[in-house]
Design a protein with these regions (language model features):
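Extreme N-terminal basic, low-complexity initiation segments
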Residues: 1-10
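Intrinsically disordered, low-complexity tandem-repeat regions
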Residues: 2, 45-46
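N-terminal, polar/charged subdomain of small-to-medium soluble alpha/beta proteins
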Residues: 11-39, 46-48, 52-128, 134-136, ...
Length: 193
């Protein structure tokens, strides 16, 4: 990731998570490798220390990895989309992503989670958001992944401008208060449906 982008290793309960907001292309396979590598009950100084310790690879108890990749599509609301632009207040976006990971950890304690979101111009077919969840059981991995994307849409301060044939428009972004219990319950209901 570029030096100006936000990457954060977050310590929560008994495991770690990686969250980030970047203008660089997203790689779900790299994020998945990083999430699998995060070992419970281990304190990492920063992102680089995880990469430098190959002996920290952890996956013996995991039976599932679930991923989600959000892509830029070529249409929306009956219009042909040319490209999207995402903007964010990066420090607050990283904090909101970390909060989502903490919430997921409370609901699914065995899950380790990573979330990255792009900013800047994205062309059709490019990944805008990636989520990786690893867990001993597939149900928890799927549910945590689904919960994470619902909460990203609710609370992360990232704004999207859609450029279409004949114009452009800002689309409504995150509007829920991160502390709003009703919004959390909606996301949890969707994740567990």
């Amino acid at each position: 990731m570029a030096a100006s982008d936000g990457v954060q290793m977050t310590r929560y309960t008994e495991c770690m998570a990686q969250v980030g907001v970047t203008s660089e292309p997203l790689d779900v396979h790299a994020l998945t490798r990083e999430v699998v590598r995060l070992k419970p009950d281990t304190t990492y100084e920063d992102e680089e220390s995880v990469r430098l310790k190959p002996d920290t690879t952890y996956g013996g108890t995991d039976g599932a990895i679930a991923t989600f990749t959000g892509l830029v599509r070529d249409h929306n609301q009956g219009r042909r989309v040319r490209f999207l632009e995402y903007e964010a207040y990066v420090p607050l976006a990283v904090r909101a992503l970390s909060l989502i990971v903490e919430e997921a950890q409370i609901a699914w304690p065995t899950v380790r989670l990573g979330i990255h979101h792009r900013i800047g111009r994205l062309d059709i077919g490019e990944a805008s958001v990636i989520i990786a969840a690893t867990s001993p059981h597939r149900g928890d991995a799927f549910a945590a992944c689904r919960y994470a994307i619902e909460r990203v849409k609710q609370i992360v301060p990232i704004w999207k401008r859609e450029h279409f044939e004949g114009g452009e428009v800002w689309l409504e972004g995150a509007t829920a208060d991160p502390e709003d219990e009703a919004a959390k319950q909606v996301a949890h209901r969707i994740a567990c449906a």
